[in-house]
Amino acid sequence: MLSNIKNLSLTKKLVYKIVFFIFCLIPFFSGLDSIPPLDRDESRFVQSTYQMIETNDYINIKFLDEIRAKKPIGIYWAQSIFANIFGEDKISSYRYVSTLGALITILVLWKFSQILFGQKASLFVVSASMISLLFIFESHVAKTDTLLLSFITFQQYLLLKIILNKKKSILFDLIIPISMWLALGVGFLIKGPISLVVFIFTLSSYVLWSKDINLLKNIRPFWGIICFMIIVFPWVFIIQKLSLIHISEPTR
């Protein structure tokens, strides 16, 4: 009897989660193919990715005849994957990256806020994000911001898991820290050092506030930095080799 009640409760929770996820899809997928370009930068990102696909050159980013490599290459690679799958002539193909970023952000934020505030409060937090006009707008624009936000949110969630962990296991000792550094590296490839700045600020603020020096060891900085460099360094090296940009040039 108790087992049946427990199974029914788990089934209801699963149904709630599925319904909630479907509810998330409605504002983010509406109008992706019918809304015209909303931003000057969106047109530039789309055109640059389109040229990347047409020329089959996935390193040398260009907007028309102008070299466009002041921002890292991650967003162009992500957009090109969706454009190759769904069609390079459809504006929605390039926007799916931002939509996916928005969905990942919502799902990670849901888990994040469950840990911090509990089940009921987490629904309020996520619902507030979902009805934000700015958030919905950004999920419809083929730019970097929403995808970057998803990796920053995921990285912060993993850092929280490391902070709260009190037991020894390969999951918390290696897999979660390495995953956090990988998310940090991908975030860097999307929009430069912004994800790194957020990570350093959060980490240093928590350590200064809590006096928990062990956290600096628990994030596995040695292996983490190696993983970070494996992701970031090849692009930096290639760009320097091709003399496309100077790393010190400010991002537009």
Q: Which residue ranges define each predicted feature?
A:
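Membrane-integral, polyisoprenol-dependent glycosyltransferases
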Residues: 2-248, 252
